[in-house]
From Swiss-Prot:
Keywords from the named record: Signal
Protein name: Uncharacterized protein At5g64816
Organism this protein belongs to: Arabidopsis thaliana
A single cellular component GO annotation: plastid
UniProt key word Signal: yes
Signal peptide boundaries: 1-18
InterPro entries xref list: At5g64816-like
């Protein structure tokens, strides 16, 4: 009879230890997620982000290949609530300004601007941390 109790205790103790370790690991993961989310928040003096976008030949090839009367080498500075927002808006103001005969051109142009700004943002953030 005593041997049965020892075998039950022997099986229960590792299960209890593993359960406790799993709970600690889960709690630690939640704390890390909260810390990283706080790091992405803007402080009170960083309410707006400003981006300066200039229409280079390269940008016009990528974004405004079919834009009507593009004006190369013009720059616009726009402020927004995020880098992506400010960059997309500045790109739209420099490249997508003139109406085009192609249907939905402005929508296409705005999507291209946002796509290029996302690429730029991800490449600058990866180079920042490497």
């Amino acid at each position: 009879m005593v041997e049965v109790w020892w075998s039950l205790i022997g099986a229960a103790v590792p299960a209890l230890i593993a359960g406790q370790a799993w709970r600690i690991k889960k709690r630690h993961g939640e704390e890390e997620r909260i810390k990283s989310a706080r790091g992405r928040e803007k402080s009170s003096d960083e309410i707006f982000v400003c981006e300066r976008v200039c229409t280079s030949k390269r940008m016009l090839k990528k974004v405004g290949a079919f834009s009507k009367d593009p004006i190369p080498d013009t720059c616009v500075t726009v402020c927004g609530v995020s880098e992506l927002d400010a960059c997309s808006d500045a790109c739209a103001r420099t490249v997508c300004v003139n109406q085009h005969q192609v249907a939905n051109w402005n929508d296409i142009c705005l999507r291209r601007c946002q796509s290029e700004c996302l690429k730029l943002s991800s490449s600058s953030s990866s180079s920042r941390y490497s």
